[in-house]
Every structure is written in C-alpha cells, then in structure tokens.
Amino acid sequence: MLRPTILAALAALTFTVAATASPGAQVARAELGAYTTAHTGVVTDSTVTADAHVVATSDGRTILRVTAEGLAPGGSYAVHVHFGACTDYLGHFQYQHPGAATRDNEVWLDLDANAAGRASDQVQVAPFNLDQSLSLVIHQHSNPDTGPGAGPPGPRIACGNLELNA
C-alpha cells in the first residue's frame, strides 16, 4: 500500500502534468515553509511544509492545488494568495483592491488535516495575473464566515513565494 505522502505527490504530479499539457497554460509554484523572521501575526516555529501549484489554463480556468504536512491532526486551515513576497508581510490578494475579504474577492482554499497531519485540496478560482509578486500563506485557522463580525483566519504559519513557470 502506498503511503499518504506518496499518494499526495502522485496526485500533485498528475494535476501538474494534466494542467500544463494544454498549450498556453501558465504555472506558478511555491514551496511553503516556516517564517524565519519574527513579525506581527507570524508564527516562526511552525513545522508545516507544503507544495502548491497555481495553473492558469488556456481555456480561462485558474486552479490552485496545495498539499501540506506537519499540520495538527484534524485541524482546519485557511490558505490565501497574498500580495508581495513572504518577507513583505502584505495582505490578501484581492480582485477588487481595496475590497471585501470574501471568497469572491480573494483566493481562498480550505485544508482539513487527516490524523497524520497531512492535507491536500484544490479549488478553481477566477483568473488572476500570475506574473506579479505574490505569495501563498497558510493561516493557523480555517477561513472565517464572511459578513459582519467575520474574524480573521489567525496567524500565518507557513509561506512560499509563487514563481511563474517554476
């Protein structure tokens, strides 16, 4: 029987190969890890690592896929695209900036860790320009409900800079 990490790696490889097979597709990749510099709202002793791909296909689809490990077993986490590099500590990428912190205006993905602290998921989102300084952040808590009184997803526990056609 294949171990979950091997299955996740195969799934990510299958996803990447299938998505990049179409001519004109753009692929951005990020390897996420712990922050190394203390900053407000950042956890520096995280053991979370992840691999992420954003694929913009020639037919107009944009898909984000994240595979992570080192999460708390059974935990739920928010993943967001952020403006700038990890060391810039900027806010969430928004289609209409400044705007509402909603699934429709930002790139959100939910990760739910299994008993071994691993998670993998993907989401199709509205197209956005991959040829700009962006990073991918895993937050300590799941995505909040939207609307009045919605809370933030907590501190940042892992980050990786998106690199186009990496």
Predicted regions and their residues:
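N-terminal leader/targeting pre-sequences
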Residues: 2-166
